[in-house]
Amino acid sequence: MEYTLDIYTKQPEQLMQRMAQNCKARRLERGYSRRTLSERTGVPAPTIERFETTGKISFESFCALVVEFDYFQEMSQILSMPKYTTGSELETIHRNKKRQKGR
């Protein structure tokens, strides 16, 4: 199973599929059936099957899987720090740091 993500074609669908593949790999490593994972997380088995085949799942259900596989800390770090690619973006980030609302 290939786990590469082409950084030049950053498509949400690719990320969703990669997360689904990774989740399935973690499930199989633990020896869980979809039914067992469903019982442990409260995520319906058909939802898990759809996620593993299409990459589509609600964020709430995805978070339940993340917690079950003990990736809470890693997930909580996503979007925790600003990212920028240009000096202009960095200036905007610093200027807007104290803002509470978008425009």
Place the predicted regions along the sequence by residue.
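Amphipathic alpha-helical protein-protein interaction surfaces
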Residues: 53, 71-74
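A short, Lys/Arg-rich alpha-helix, primarily the initiator
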Residues: 2-28, 78
